[in-house]
Regions:
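Conduit-forming functional cores of very large proteins
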Residues: 1-334
């Protein structure tokens, strides 16, 4: 990458909404080609359907401010498994022994409880929840003084794994099903309960779409949290559009932008368009009044059934987990 100058830094969420998700869009100008491009900086990486990891910040993050000159090939965030020398730590050093043991059969292996924490990894799960036409959310995370229909960024879901609960609108039952107290409890039989199969997962990102062209049965009092996030995301996109329009006015035909930045601007324009001027669809279906995307980080600690592999093609399935004091030792106590 060529040296560049940072023109604009835009944060996705203000501190009033979230101070745990440091997502930024950094808009830069290439010092060689004068192309306008952008970096999307977020605290985690997940390019797989599930697997991912938390980034490790480098000292170069101190250079992220407007007007800053960025040297070529500058790295802001990198893998936590990379040493300062540039080498990758792609495994865990463990003592291994091959011997006859009652816990071993075929390709099974015995693993010490003491080393399991060294193999902890993260997966990232995406949940998409649409509602508003026939279903409305319940205030299961709030109380009589606040509305909280889903966990905020940085919150961990409970041991029951519940993320959100939706109830079908019934005009005949509204007098008992749509009271302040009824909003705070769900019925696992009659209500639609959305869960994550991994309890205590952490919410790391939230994205919300609001489609005002759809007919909504949403009680206004249950929309506060939704509106707070939607407003913040809209302001984030408005800043992107506003800066792009400033560039167009100042540079005219000389404006040179990357394909990726152009796509970001289009996305921002769609989100900030006058609500009655555009109909939001997904796979040719008109979106419901609200569509919520939640990204959850799950910490996985290996246990029985997980597979371990070595550097030389050796592998096995953990079939027995033993306390450290029950593991075999040699004459030197190793």
């Amino acid at each position: 990458n060529n040296p560049s100058t940072i023109l604009k830094v835009i944060r996705k969420f203000p501190d009033t909404i979230d101070n745990k998700n440091e997502q930024l869009v950094v808009i830069l100008e290439d010092a060689v080609t004068n192309e306008i491009k952008h970096l999307h900086i977020k605290p985690y990486c997940s390019n797989h359907s599930y697997f991912g990891y938390d980034y490790k910040k480098t000292n170069n993050t101190n250079l992220i401010f407007e007007g800053s000159n960025i040297p070529e090939n500058t790295v802001f965030m990198e893998s936590p498994n990379k040493f300062d020398s540039g080498e990758y730590n792609y495994g865990v050093e463990c003592n291994i022994v091959g011997l006859t043991h009652h816990g071993v059969s075929e390709d099974s292996i015995v693993v010490s409880e003491a080393v399991l924490d060294k193999f902890i990894f993260h997966t990232y799960h995406k949940k998409t929840i649409s509602f508003g036409n026939n279903l409305f959310p319940l205030n299961i995370f709030g109380d009589k003084n606040s509305v909280k229909i889903f966990p905020n960024i940085g919150d961990k879901i409970g041991i029951d794994g519940v993320i959100m609960a939706l109830r079908k609108h019934d005009p005949l039952m509204a007098v008992v099903e749509q009271t302040e107290e009824a909003y705070r409890e769900y019925d696992s039989i009659t209500d639609k309960v959305i869960c994550c199969e991994y309890p205590e997962a952490e919410v790391v990102d939230i994205h919300i779409y609001k489609n005002v062209t759809s007919n909504s049965i949403m009680p206004a009092e249950l929309e506060k949290q939704l509106n707070d996030y939607h407003y913040s995301i809209k302001k984030y996109y408005e800043k992107i559009v506003e800066f792009y329009q400033t560039l167009r006015r100042n540079r005219g035909d000389n404006l040179n932008i990357s394909k990726e930045f152009r796509q970001l601007v289009i996305e921002a324009m769609i989100y900030t368009k006058e609500p009655d001027k555009i109909v939001l669809t997904y796979k040719n279906e008109v979106l419901e009044p609200w569509r919520v995307h939640l990204t959850l980080k799950v910490k996985i600690r290996p246990t029985i059934g997980f597979k371990w592999t070595g550097d030389f093609g050796d592998k096995g399935v953990g079939c027995t987990i033993l306390p450290e004091e029950q593991m075999p030792i040699d004459e030197l106590g190793n």
